[in-house]
């Protein structure tokens, strides 16, 4: 796993997390307890903060990023992010499934107990 500080910010994570060998986590990122970050995932808090709750599963090839000076990214508790999804500058509440290959864009808000179908594109609310 590649862990990289940027602008004095270093990723932090809680207890009992799994990180695949080639996952990349950069900058102002905080990950809760009991999370799994799978192969080829990139979580890049280089331009704004990223906060990930407890019991979150981010599957292979996913990208989580934020929007420069505008939107941080927040992922709640008990969230599953499917393979190759893109989460960018948005808020995802608790108990959400983001389907494989989905894109959740800047300023979108996904409410609790929501399922996003595979391949969906969610734009700003």
Region spans (language model):
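Extreme N-terminal tail/first-helix region
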Residues: 1-15
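Left-handed beta-helix
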Residues: 15, 20-21, 26-27, 32-33, ...
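Phosphate/pyrophosphate-binding betaalpha-module
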Residues: 49
